[in-house]
């Protein structure tokens, strides 16, 4: 008798419980070789003052099983609560988010019948690191964190995925014309790794034009690899133009753990009505079965699901009176899929997953390269001051004893306002004062400490210090507009 794989089940919020019940019903009837352990996460935990939406007991279950099938959850939009999705992905180091998007034309409505692409999204970094601050009465900050090792992991994963799944092209999307360091390193690593895969075509688009092309000509894409925020946005764009966000599932893959979920949210507006489409979570479950080596059950369910779609048995979100034959509720849809277990689709591609899946290389040991010579050459000190002119700030600072430093520039929101007059008056309470060593020698941390003491004695409210570094003689800090 084949061993049963333990799976953690999270019912989620909103429509989550009803679509999870439908999916588990199908899995039981298909005789999936899994054993279930249920955890409570999301809204109920937030209401119990778990700011992360998950308890220690649930973490113990996840650590024991290693695999999660999760329905959508609702994250409160205020009050300091953290996104549970982001927390799980980061805690379990699920660095790769895999979102296949396929058109099921002519059985679902879409303008893009040949749509068939996969979005591979970096899952741990970027603005989704969730590092944010309020610095002044007027200014808020969210940090975009991108690492060299993180870029290498996700980009190599994308090319390996292309090889494994017989894909022909990988497209990289960034905004490195503006964010030259963070998005720039993503693009540079993409170019470097692409050279190792000459059999795979590669290309790059700026995210705005890339998204426009995705919305109008998705057929030109095969695999898209991108960073966290961009990937989140374009995944929903792609799912929507496929015919319904409710059809798409996704996988979150790491070295030791994996989580499978629908792309769509918890849809509280239709919760409890029994009309939600369970297909997204079902497709996520199919991806899970493939991942754990139960390709036979995955194929059985996917073929039955496709036959159900072909037969025009649709939930309300994709129902079309001209092409659908029957409108069904969530539970009825599950029953219709179960009726077709063992049947094959006629028009849509038949699924035939292998029983034993070769695990994609996701445990490469990426070490931090420390060979570049790092030199501290200056510091940006951000201050909170209610003035209308950067000249007032410069006059005050230049009267202080600041040692071997000199004040080079003052800027606000990246616009240089001193030493030269600005064309326009800037209303701000958030100023960046750039200090460099007068003789160009390396700066010590003690020098910066003494500088901060001088500012403090003058009642200048410094709110952040960002040191400026050269690596192998190259300046790795941005210049203000106009500098």
UniProtKB/Swiss-Prot annotation:
User: Which residues does the record give as Mg(2+) binding sites?
Assistant: 232
Give UniProt keywords alphabetically. Glyoxylate bypass, Magnesium, Manganese, Metal-binding, NADP, Oxidoreductase, Tricarboxylic acid cycle
Reaction(s) catalysed by this chain, per the record, are:
D-threo-isocitrate + NADP(+) = 2-oxoglutarate + CO2 + NADPH
Q: Which family does it belong to?
A: Belongs to the isocitrate and isopropylmalate dehydrogenases family.
Name assigned to this protein: Isocitrate dehydrogenase [NADP]
Q: Where is this site: Critical for catalysis?
A: 128, 175
Cofactor note text: Binds 1 Mg(2+) or Mn(2+) ion per subunit.
Cofactor(s) listed in the protein's UniProt record: Mg(2+); Mn(2+)
Q: Which residues bind D-threo-isocitrate?
A: 83, 85, 89, 99, 121
Q: What does this protein do?
A: Catalyzes the oxidative decarboxylation of isocitrate to 2-oxoglutarate and carbon dioxide with the concomitant reduction of NADP(+).
Q: Which SMART domains match?
A: Iso_dh (SM01329)
Q: Which gene encodes it?
A: icd
Organism expressing this protein natively: Rickettsia prowazekii (strain Madrid E)
Annotated residues that bind NADP(+) are located at: 74, 264-270, 277
